[in-house]
Design a protein with these regions (language model features):
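Bacterial N-terminal signal peptides that target proteins for export
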Residues: 2-15
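Bacterial N-terminal signal peptides
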Residues: 12-25
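Structured, acidic catalytic/metal-binding patches in enzyme active sites
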Residues: 30-246
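A cross-kingdom marker for long, charged
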Residues: 241-304
C-alpha cells in the first residue's frame, strides 16, 4: 500500500502525539510541575513531561521547561527525530499493518463496528480504500492523525519538534530512548481483539479530540498530574494490556537508560509524553522506587 507523502510526515512526526492520545486525558486544576530534577554525583538530570502537538497560539514553553532546556548540555527524547527516516514508519505500516489478501478490516472488526469506523473516515475526508485493508491498529493511527490535523493542533509545534529544532540551532546533542519502529511495534504486537478495542475507542474519541487536547494542555501547563492520572486510570480500565504496553513496559525499558544518565558528567534534559509520569508504573514512581529523588522544579512566577 502506498501512503501519501503528507501522511508519511504526519505518521512519523506525529506518532508520539498519537501515542499520547491513545487514551483520553481530561481535567484541570492548579497543580505542581511538569518538570523535575534529579542530582547525580556530578550532574543534574531534568525530566519533563511534554505535549506532542500544540496549536499556533499556544506553543510557547512553560517557564520551568525553558529553564531546564537552557541548563542542559544534552537532550534526550522518546525518539531522536533528526535520526529518523519518515519513510521507515510508512514502510513498517505497509509491511506489518496490512491485512492478508483474503481479509479486510471489516472482516476483522465486524460489520457494525466497521460502519462506525467508515463513517469517521468519511467525516475526515479519508477514502475508505485507505483503511479497508489495514490492521485495526494501523487504521486507528491513520484516522487519529487525520483527526489531529483537523483540530488545528500541529505535531510540528509540539514540544519534541520545537526542542529538536532549538537543539539543532544551539548545537546541543539529541539522543533517543527508542525508535519509531519500537513505538509502532507496540501496536503491531497486540491481538486483533485489543487492536479492535483501540480502534473503536479512537473512533469514539475523535469527535471530542479538540476539547480533550485543550484540557490536556491546560493540565500539562499547570503541572497537574493528579488530574491526568485520575482520568487516565479510568481510561486504563478499558484496555489494561494496551495501557501496560504503551506506558508501563516502555517506562521500565527506559528506566535503566535514564538512571545511567545520573552517572555522567553532563547535564541532561529528558523529555517524554506527560502521561509517562503518572501512576504506579510512571517514571516518577519507578525512579523513586529505585531510591532516586525527583524534585519538582517550581515556577519562577505564578501561572497566568
Amino acid at each position: 500500500m502506498i501512503f501519501p507523502q503528507a501522511m508519511s510526515r504526519g505518521l512519523a512526526r506525529g506518532l508520539a502525539g498519537v501515542l499520547l492520545l491513545a487514551f483520553g486525558a481530561h481535567g484541570y486544576a492548579r497543580g505542581e510541575s511538569s518538570v523535575w530534577s534529579m542530582k547525580g554525583e556530578r550532574n543534574t538530570v531534568y525530566l519533563a513531561g511534554s505535549v506532542h502537538a500544540l496549536p499556533k497560539d499556544h506553543a510557547e514553553f512553560p517557564e520551568q521547561l525553558e529553564r531546564a532546556y537552557k541548563a542542559a548540555n544534552i537532550i534526550v527524547l522518546e525518539v531522536d527525530l533528526d535520526d529518523m527516516n519518515p519513510l521507515d514508519a510508512v514502510k513498517f505500516i505497509s509491511t506489518n499493518g496490512t491485512l492478508p489478501a483474503d481479509k479486510s478490516l471489516k472482516d476483522v472488526v465486524g460489520a457494525e463496528p466497521y460502519q462506525r469506523v467508515a463513517a469517521l473516515a468519511a467525516s475526515l475526508d479519508v477514502p475508505e480504500t485507505v483503511i479497508a485493508k489495514l490492521e485495526p491498529w494501523a487504521a486507528a493511527l491513520v484516522l487519529t492523525q487525520f483527526a489531529l490535523n483537523k483540530t488545528g493542533f500541529d505535531a510540528n509545534l509540539g514540544i519534541d519538534m520545537q526542542i529538536t529544532e532549538r537543539a539543532r540551532t544551539d548545537g546541543k546533542p539529541v539522543e533517543g530512548l527508542e525508535t519509531v519502529i519500537d513505538q509502532l511495534s507496540v501496536f503491531d504486537n497486540r491481538s486483533f481483539e485489543e487492536q479492535t478495542r483501540f480502534l473503536l475507542d479512537s473512533a469514539d474519541d475523535a469527535p471530542k479530540l479538540t476539547e480533550d487536547l485543550q484540557k490536556l494542555i491546560a493540565a500539562w501547563r499547570a503541572g497537574n498530574l493528579r488530574a491526568l492520572e485520575k482520568e487516565f486510570l479510568k481510561e486504563r480500565k478499558k484496555s489494561p494490556e494496551l495501557y501496560d504496553a504503551l506506558l508501563g513496559v516502555r517506562n521500565r525499558q527506559w528506566l535503566p537508560k535514564i538512571e545511567a544518565l545520573l552517572k555522567g558528567d553532563q547535564d541532561y534534559l529528558v523529555v517524554v509524553g506527560a502521561l509517562h509520569f503518572v501512576g504506579r508504573d510512571g517514571l516518577l514512581s519507578l525512579l523513586r522506587r529505585d531510591g532516586h529523588k525527583a524534585v519538582a522544579v517550581p515556577a519562577a512566577k505564578p501561572p497566568r
